[in-house]
């Protein structure tokens, strides 16, 4: 599933194409994704201008001049691709034919086309009054953004205090911190030297103090690399992300630990149905 860096990469790719532009046609090619699409979605989108493109956790939020916001979640296999919209004087390329899993297609007044493709249909879209966006069921219970000012040592120390769930599970709890996923929690815990098996409430304040900036750095590096492409994820121009080439533990089971002088190999354990990758020697 695309995590925060992948969704932020997509948002940044869409921003210059969508922000300030008007949707002249919305082609809704099926009535549902993971859940039914919003009623009258076509008429609620057509003719509307996108004022702002934001991200909350793993959701893209397109604020419309109608007073509504389009909420987009990529799910497991969703991708958003941009076609057309060449600069003035550039050679014109015909828009490619739509594919089987192109479920929502937005054409803009610039000639650009934005296509939501989702083979497994675990993605989601909804429309919500912008003034009520924070109360939307998909967003209402989310914790602070890990790259925002509300996520800091004191906050995380308080949220982890007394918790007997593993630190890995605590960081994946979207009520604790929004947008973190399996890949980047594994990578951050490795860099912080914290075992994913350690009880969250038994991580010292000193180690939490180092974990918070490490989480920020890992996410920032992943965004800079365009995210991680393991299966379906693509950037908006169709290119792969590149952060998977920089994994230190994730998806490296039985590979030598990258820490100089460490004789151990990366191990994999299953926690709450998800694979955790770590080095038993470097992470305690």
From Swiss-Prot:
EC number(s) reported in the record: 3.2.2.23, 4.2.99.18
Catalysis: reaction(s): Hydrolysis of DNA containing ring-opened 7-methylguanine residues, releasing 2,6-diamino-4-hydroxy-5-(N-methyl)formamidopyrimidine; 2'-deoxyribonucleotide-(2'-deoxyribose 5'-phosphate)-2'-deoxyribonucleotide-DNA = a 3'-end 2'-deoxyribonucleotide-(2,3-dehydro-2,3-deoxyribose 5'-phosphate)-DNA + a 5'-end 5'-phospho-2'-deoxyribonucleoside-DNA + H(+)
UniProt-recorded name of the protein: Formamidopyrimidine-DNA glycosylase
Residues annotated as the enzyme's active site: 2-3, 58, 274
Quaternary state and interactors: Monomer.
Cofactor stoichiometry and binding remark: Binds 1 zinc ion per subunit.
Cofactor: Zn(2+)
UniProt zinc finger (FPG-type) residues: 248-284
Gene name, Swiss-Prot/TrEMBL: mutM
Keyword DNA repair: yes
Entry keywords, A to Z: DNA damage, DNA repair, DNA-binding, Glycosidase, Hydrolase, Lyase, Metal-binding, Multifunctional enzyme, Zinc, Zinc-finger
Family: Belongs to the FPG family.
MF (Gene Ontology): 8-oxo-7,8-dihydroguanine DNA N-glycosylase activity; class I DNA-(apurinic or apyrimidinic site) endonuclease activity; damaged DNA binding; zinc ion binding
Highest classification ranks of the organism: Bacteria, Pseudomonadati, Pseudomonadota, Alphaproteobacteria, Rhodobacterales
Record: residues binding DNA: 101, 120, 163
PROSITE patterns in alphabetical order: FPG_CAT, ZF_FPG_2
Pfam families, per database record: Fapy_DNA_glyco, H2TH
GO-annotated biological processes: base-excision repair
Disulfide bonds: none
Function text: Involved in base excision repair of DNA damaged by oxidation or by mutagenic agents. Acts as a DNA glycosylase that recognizes and removes damaged bases. Has a preference for oxidized purines, such as 7,8-dihydro-8-oxoguanine (8-oxoG). Has AP (apurinic/apyrimidinic) lyase activity and introduces nicks in the DNA strand. Cleaves the DNA backbone by beta-delta elimination to generate a single-strand break at the site of the removed base with both 3'- and 5'-phosphates.
Keyword flag Hydrolase: yes
């Amino acid at each position: 599933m695309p995590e925060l860096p992948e969704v932020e990469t997509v948002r940044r790719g869409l921003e210059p194409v969508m922000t300030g532009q008007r949707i002249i046609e919305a082609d809704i090619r099926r009535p549902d994704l993971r859940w039914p699409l919003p009623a009258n979605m076509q008429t609620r989108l057509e003719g509307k201008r996108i004022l702002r493109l934001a991200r909350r956790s793993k959701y893209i939020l397109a604020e419309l001049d109608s007073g509504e916001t389009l909420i987009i979640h990529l799910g497991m296999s969703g991708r958003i691709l941009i076609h057309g919209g060449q600069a003035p004087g550039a050679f014109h390329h015909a828009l490619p034919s739509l594919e089987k899993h192109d479920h929502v297609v937005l054409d803009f007044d610039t000639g650009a086309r934005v296509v939501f493709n989702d083979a497994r249909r675990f993605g989601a879209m909804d429309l919500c009054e912008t003034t009520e966006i924070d109360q939307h069921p998909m967003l209402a219970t989310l914790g602070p953004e890990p790259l925002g000012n509300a996520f800091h040592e004191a906050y995380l120390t308080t949220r982890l205090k007394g918790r007997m769930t593993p630190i890995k599970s605590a960081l994946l709890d979207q009520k604790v911190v929004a947008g973190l996923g399996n890949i980047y929690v594994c990578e951050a815990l490795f860099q912080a030297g914290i075992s994913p098996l350690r009880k969250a409430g038994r991580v010292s304040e000193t180690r939490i103090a180092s974990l918070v900036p490490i989480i920020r750095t890992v996410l920032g590096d992943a965004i800079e690399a365009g995210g991680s492409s393991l299966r379906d994820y693509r950037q908006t121009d169709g290119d792969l992300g590149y952060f998977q080439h920089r994994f230190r533990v994730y998806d490296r089971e039985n590979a030598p630990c990258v820490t100089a002088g460490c004789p151990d190999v990366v191990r994999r354990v299953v926690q709450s149905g998800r694979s955790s990758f770590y080095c038993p020697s470097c992470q305690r």
